């Protein structure tokens, strides 16, 4: 399975992360991605990454976990396309190990999961 369409949001997600890369490299990767004959992939904003969380299920320290129906459940940290407004050298990441949404320097390397729709 290369992609998965979220029945809750209608968004289509890339199932396999290509690995870790910087934020700028992640943007370029998304622009060049072609899966299932589709080439309109993009790096998701933080709010779209957060839709993968199930806020009704809590675990350690009362943090939500990834939704059960998501086929690529993991605990990795993913870049969003959202720049951190007070510091344009940083962007938001979503850490699925604890559902943290934090800003980090764009020169750091994190995982990428592209979306379309």
Can you say where each PLM-predicted feature lies in the sequence?
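Generic detector of ordered secondary-structure context
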Residues: 2-5, 71, 106
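Short, structured beta-strand segments at or near domain termini in extracellular proteins/domains
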Residues: 77, 103-117
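Short, P/G- and charge-enriched loop/turn segments at secondary-structure junctions
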Residues: 98-102
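An exposed tryptophan-centered "aromatic clamp" motif
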Residues: 27-40, 46-96, 116
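Extracellular adhesion/carbohydrate-recognition regions
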Residues: 1-41, 111-115
């Amino acid at each position: 399975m290369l992609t998965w369409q979220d029945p809750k949001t209608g968004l289509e997600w890339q199932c396999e992360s290509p690995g870790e890369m910087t934020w700028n490299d992640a943007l370029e990767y998304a622009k060049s991605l072609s899966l299932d004959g589709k080439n309109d992939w993009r790096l998701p904003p933080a709010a779209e990454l957060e839709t993968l969380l199930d806020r009704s299920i809590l675990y350690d320290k009362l943090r939500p976990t990834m939704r059960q129906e998501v086929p690529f459940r993991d605990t990795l940290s993913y870049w969003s396309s959202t720049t951190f407004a007070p510091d344009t050298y940083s962007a938001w990441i979503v850490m699925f190990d604890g559902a943290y949404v934090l800003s980090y320097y764009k020169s750091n390397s994190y995982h990428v999961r592209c979306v379309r729709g």
